[in-house]
Curated annotation (Swiss-Prot):
It comes from Aspergillus niger (strain ATCC MYA-4892 / CBS 513.88 / FGSC A1513). ATP binds at residues 609-616. One of its GO terms (biological process) is oxidation-dependent protein catabolic process. Gene3D superfamilies: 1.10.8.60, 1.20.5.5270, 1.20.58.1480, 3.30.230.10, LON domain-like, P-loop containing nucleotide triphosphate hydrolases. Its EC number is 3.4.21.53. This is Lon protease homolog, mitochondrial. The lineage of its organism: Eukaryota, Fungi, Dikarya, Ascomycota, Pezizomycotina.
Length: 1113
């Protein structure tokens, strides 16, 4: 607008900016009630003097001015427009003054303020005239459009964005302005009245709420996210009609801002006033509205959002022509429509919101002096006091509620007290709604008391939990506080030196007791000097301290006194293990050499054998025999080199390797370190641990072993290393070359019997509580266990089976004795009874404030062992063994009593020891001159064994061609060779002579002796080569009923080393060539008959002549 230009006041009003005045909103507490501050702020806001601000609801639309304006003369209209323009210019400043919380008037330099005493007197006179005009108009009209008003304790509507103020409209205007009496004359404009809450509001916008209902007199902030509902609320605030109905969702998980169906909400809610509304942070359309409920209402009908929007489109033109009118703020005029057709929420029909027709609910009359009401009221007050003593927040809410709602006695307002009790409680949804719906005070008070009692229980539980937690941490905090005070006092008195100096002295004392080498001593002094100059808060301080701790933990120069007694060593080794002659002899040799030299050096031994033969346990026995400290660690599956040689000190949490840790634990330089499962060591991206063992297990290098963490040479030459492995194939060759191998073979039946009787059975009896009971496991039963249940090389499974037998026996004895032999209360010792009584007291004590100590609750109560009568006896024999361990797992190894042609018995070595391996050969098709030769091989044979079968087939054909040339069996025979137990993989070269013998037996049609077993590798020229596992194979042959065993001549030394108890009853035959095997197996063979055995089948049959007869001519 150009300077000096004047506009009509209606046009100027459109350009006036209408600032939004938000009210402060406190975060809603869990009780959903207002705090004292928000109530005081609302009262202060209502008491502030405010200037008049134009409301859009009090001005007619400019498209159709009221008839009063058309009758005014042009001069008067121009003067009035000028005055209204001034009023518009002052309105924003007046509103800013009204929002000022200080309540002071603006200074003289503010825009719109009077600049002289004359102007102020003129403004006052104008205000007086306007006030007198308003009083006269109200007397003439009699009935205003607004309602009759509510009690004085209800809050007045808050003017927002041009809403009406609570003061008269002409308070700060001049006498000639629009709000004065002169401007009122003949204008038809409606004067503004003091706002009040209408008692009758038949139609309101319904807002659904979740979780908790609203109660009259208690504020609650709600969040509106629906943009249409938010826009409708903003429009209501602008028009000065901030009234809504709040109704609770029946489903506590429901959400939304629009009611689609009346069945979704309860029909009883509250008529609430929006006291403040402001946009949500981070959202463009949502608002947060603060509601103040005034009274209870009930829904009579719902106008759904779709119908409301449709109705809004048809009534839009009518609303535009008629204008927007605030029923509770303005007086009616002659131009308005009849009162009975007027609806104050008609402007909301253009929004898709929920409109409901409601009716007020009035409380039923009650007698304040009723005994029931007084008693329940008194109980509610008492419960509130109890909750206030437990919850400080609740105490503040009670104080604010009492100050605002009860100027007099509490018993005078039982209805409000019941609403307060329900509003502050955290009850169930249906319980809270039931309190809201009850109009009978005598019924409402007990319901509210029940809800409040639940809140008291919650408060008591919270208080108890808080006290329990506080009791747990109070003692620790007190000790920490006292210790800190003590440290400070000692530091001030000089009694205690600095912790760093004390640490340095401790390291020096440790180092003086050790015989550190010069190189190590130098490093120690350097690190100790660095520690003395470091601050304790520095990160390097902890690293240096830990390093010095490890340096002083290694036993430099500390050795254990070794025992060189041969007899003592033999006694100790025989106590723990039966057999293992090779290992025991090697240890005795080690002791003898040390006794002759006066000192011993470290050795690296490697015990190789099947599982369960005692490799790991013999290491502990060796340490006890030599009086050395024992340390064991397994490298099976190890893939990190740092486990052997440690981590660099630069890493966080770095530690030395296992070897340095072993020295720290043993505290000697000459311990026995057992490295278990060395054949199963792994390899990963972090290095190859087997390569790291090369330095460790090399007698020439381990005198200066260098750990990555220690970074100083450590002497390991006096350490006795014992490694264990099942096989040597997976051990790297350089590492295997550094160790002295001692092979341990599996136990035979006699050795297992001795081990079971000497070690396993007594240990199992003690473990199962049968040490003092007469339970006898016969020798025949143990033999049956070994033969039919436990055929493995070791004795682990035998130990399990014997323990199983004794466990079954213990169960049988207790079951037969019955439960009355020793009563439960008599089974406890004196100590156990004391513990039981103490636990019962702690359990039954109602005043226990802390939970039971977990250590006491998990401690086993001492009990008296059951005394079995001496008359109880139990003998477990071979026949009754199945009752304890079930049916036998292994049957007899002997598959044939007599061998048919083509069947032979070989011998094999398995992880469970030796086993009989049968080879079967058959003729697939009948021999004819036209048949084609070939061989099929089955039995899950692996590569090496398949090659042996091919060699045996070729060698058998060679033997037949040389010794039986007329026997053309292999030229025409289609053969099938099979090894039984096809589910078991089979491999190895030692079945060569067995396969060749099977083929020759079939070709010669000659059965073999079933008491002869054989093993040996065969070459194509007939040479028999060396095999392994002769001990186990011999045991298997004896178990299968063999009387003779054929083995290679190169294994003669192994045969001679076998104990006599193994070779007893078996005749050994060493062979170097297969011809010796042939002569031994086919002694009674008729070579002439064998040469022609298949001649009939292979003979050419003569062709039949034709029946045609030649005729003579």
């Amino acid at each position: 607008m150009l300077r000096g230009q004047t506009l009509p006041w209606r046009a100027a009003l459109q350009q006036v900016s209408r600032p939004f005045i938000p009210r402060p909103l406190l975060a809603p507490s869990r009780y959903n009630v207002t705090a004292r501050s928000i109530l005081n702020a609302s009262r202060l806001h209502r008491s502030l003097p405010t200037s008049r601000a134009f409301s859009s609801s009090s001005i007619r639309r400019r498209e159709k001015p009221p008839p009063g304006d058309e009758k005014d003369d042009p001069a008067q209209k121009e003067q009035k427009d000028a005055n209204e323009e001034k009023d518009v210019e002052r309105a924003p400043d007046a509103r800013r003054k009204a929002a000022d919380p200080s309540g002071k008037q603006g200074s003289s330099h503010e825009p719109g303020a009077p600049t002289s005493g004359f102007a102020r007197r003129k403004e006052k006179a104008g205000a007086d005239k306007e006030q007198r005009g308003l009083e006269e108009d109200s007397k003439k009209d009699g009935n205003a459009v607004e309602g009759k008003g509510n009690s004085s304790d209800t809050p007045s509507p808050i003017p927002v964005n041009g809403g009406s103020d609570s003061r008269p409209s002409g308070a700060n205007n001049g006498g000639n302005e629009d709000g004065g009496k002169k401007g009122k004359k003949g204008s038809g404009e409606k004067a503004l009245q003091k706002p009040s809450v209408p008692e009758v509001y038949p139609q309101v916008m319904a807002i659904p709420i979740a979780k908790r209902p609203l109660f009259p007199g208690f504020y609650k902030a709600i969040t509106i996210r629906d943009p249409n509902v938010a826009a409708a609320i903003q429009d209501m605030m602008k028009r000065g009609q901030p009234y809504v109905g709040a109704f609770l969702f029946k489903d506590e998980n429901a959400d939304g801002d629009v009611i689609e169906n009346l069945d979704d909400v309860y029909d009883v809610g509250v008529f609430a006033q929006i006291t403040a509304a402001y946009p949500l942070r981070g959202e463009a359309s949502g608002v947060t509205a603060v509601l103040y409920p005034h009274r209870r209402i009930k829904v009579s009908s719902l106008l759904p959002p779709s119908d409301a929007a449709k109705a809004g489109t048809t009534d839009e033109k009518t609303s535009e022509r008629r204008g927007d009118v605030v029923a509770s703020f303005e007086e009616g005029t002659a131009e308005l429509a009849p009162k009975d057709h007027y609806e104050p929420t008609s402007f909301l029909r253009k929004y898709p919101v929920s409109l409901v027709n409601v009716e007020n609910l009035a409380e039923e009359p009650y007698d304040k002096k009723s005994a029931i009401i007084r008693a329940v009221t008194s109980e509610i007050v008492n419960v509130c006091k109890e909750i206030a003593s437990l919850n400080p927040l609740f105490r503040d809410q009670i104080s604010a509620f009492y100050t605002d709602q009860f100027p007099g006695n509490l018993s005078d307002e039982p209805a409000k007290l019941a609403d307060f009790a329900a509003a502050v409680s955290a009850g169930e949804l249906n319980e809270m709604q039931e309190v809201l719906e009850l109009m009978n005070i005598e019924e409402r008070l007990p319901k509210a008391l029940v809800v409040l009692k639940k809140e008291l229980m919650n408060a008591q539980l919270q208080s108890k939990i808080s006290k329990d937690v506080e009791a747990k941490i109070q003692k620790r905090q007190r000790e920490y506080w006292l210790m800190e005070q003590m440290k400070g006092i000692k530091r001030e008195l000089g009694i205690e030196s600095d912790g760093k100096d004390k640490l340095v002295e401790k390291f020096k004392e440790k180092a003086e007791k050790l015989a550190m080498p010069d190189a190590v001593k130098k490093v120690f002094d350097e690190e100790l000097n660095k520690l003395a100059h470091l601050e304790p808060a520095a990160s390097e301080f902890n690293v240096t301290r830990n390093y010095l701790d490890w340096l002083t933990q290694i036993p430099w120069g500390q050795k254990s006194v070794e025992n060189f007694g041969i007899q003592h060593a033999v006694k100790v080794l025989d106590e723990d293990h039966y057999g293992l002659k090779d290992v025991k002899d090697r240890i005795l040799e080690f002791i003898a050499v040390g006794k002759l030299r006066g000192t011993v050096e470290g050795k690296i031994l490697c015990l190789v054998g099947p599982p369960g033969v005692g490799k790991t346990s013999i290491g502990k026995s060796i340490a006890r025999a030599l009086n050395r400290q024992y340390y064991r660690f397994s490298v099976g599956g190890l893939t990190d080199v740092a486990e052997i040689k440690g981590h660099r000190r630069t890493y966080v949490g770095a530690l030395p390797g296992r070897i340095i840790q072993a020295l720290k634990k043993c505290q000697t330089e000459n311990p026995l370190i057992l490295i278990d499962e060395i054949d199963k060591i792994g390899r990963g991206h972090q290095g190859d641990p087997s390569s790291a063992l090369l330095e460790l297990l090399d007698p020439e290098q381990n005198s200066s072993f260098l750990d990555h963490y220690m970074d100083v040479p450590v002497d390991l030459s006096k350490v006795l290393f014992v490694c264990t492995a099942n096989v040597t194939d997976t051990i790297p060759r350089p590492l295997l070359d550094r160790m002295e191998l001692i092979e341990l073979s599996g136990y035979v039946a006699d050795e297992k019997m001795a081990i079971a009787q000497r070690y396993l059975a007594p240990a199992a009896r003690e473990l199962t509580g049968l040490k003092e009971v007469d339970v006898n496991l016969t020798e025949e039963a143990v033999e049956e266990l070994i033969k039919s249940y436990c055929r493995e090389s070791g004795v682990r499974n035998l130990k399990k089976q014997i323990e199983k037998v004794y466990r079954k026996a213990a169960y049988k004895i207790v079951r037969d004795l019955g439960e009355d032999v020793l009563a439960e209360e008599k089974a406890l010792t004196d100590e156990g009874k004391a513990v039981q009584e103490e636990s019962q007291k702690e359990t039954e004590s109602p005043d226990s404030k802390s939970p039971v100590d977990p250590e006491k609750s998990t401690t086993e109560t001492p009990r008296v062992a059951l005394k079995v009568p001496e008359s109880v006896q139990l003998s477990i024999g071979k026949d009754s063994l199945t009752d304890y361990v079930g049916p036998p797992i292994f049957t007899a190894d002997r598959l044939y009593d007599t061998f048919p042609p083509g069947v032979t018995m070989g011998l094999a070595w398995t992880s469970m020891g030796g086993a009989a391996l049968y080879v079967e050969s058959i003729l697939e098709n009948a021999l004819t001159p036209q048949s084609r030769p070939g061989i099929d091989i089955t039995g899950n044979l692996q590569n090496v064994m398949k090659e042996s079968s091919q060699i045996a087939y070729s060698f058998a054909k060679s033997v037949m061609a040389k010794q039986f040339p007329e026997n053309r069996f292999f030229e025409k025979a289609k053969l099938h060779m099979h090894c039984p137990e096809g589910a078991v993989p089979k491999d190895g070269p030692s079945a060569g002579i067995t396969m060749a013998t099977s083929l020759l037996s079939l070709a010669l049609n000659h059965p073999l002796d079933p008491t002869i077993a054989m093993t040996g590798e065969l070459t194509v020229t007939g040479k028999v080569l060396r095999i392994g596992g002769l001990r186990e194979k011999t045991v298997a042959a004896r178990r299968a009923g063999a009387k003779k065993i054929v083995f290679p001549a190169d294994n003669m030394s192994d045969w001679l080393e076998l104990p006599e108890n193994i070779k007893e009853g078996i005749e050994g035959h060493a062979v170097g060539w297969y011809s010796e095997v042939f002569d031994l197996l086919f002694t009674d063979l008729d070579k002439g008959a064998a040469n022609h055995v298949w001649q009939k089948q292979l003979a050419e049959k003569p062709e039949k002549k034709s029946n045609e007869v030649e005729e003579d001519e």
